[in-house]
Amino acid sequence: APLEPVYPGDDATPEQMAQYAAELRRYINMLTRPRYGKRDEEDLLDLKCSSLHAAAPRELSPMGA
């Protein structure tokens, strides 16, 4: 994983802040970029539905008598 850029401090020059902003943008893009090929959409949909079901509170789940 890429390293998070270090904040240059409140007394940094505008150039340092601009460089930090650019590095931070690159870092966030690396972490949040979509990863294709791991699962197809149907599997992802099944995964979302099953995790929603698993996360439902027990009170809402049907109880066997």
Curated annotation (Swiss-Prot):
Note the pro-peptide positions.
Answer: 59-65
Keyword annotations for this protein, in alphabetical order, are: Amidation, Hormone, Secreted
The keyword Secreted is annotated on this UniProt entry? yes
- What is its induction? Induced in hypoglycemia, and, in vitro, by carbocal, in fetal pancreatic cells.
Q: Where in the cell is it found?
A: Secreted
PANTHER family, A to Z: NEUROPEPTIDE Y/PANCREATIC HORMONE/PEPTIDE YY, PANCREATIC POLYPEPTIDE PROHORMONE
Protein name as annotated: Pancreatic polypeptide prohormone
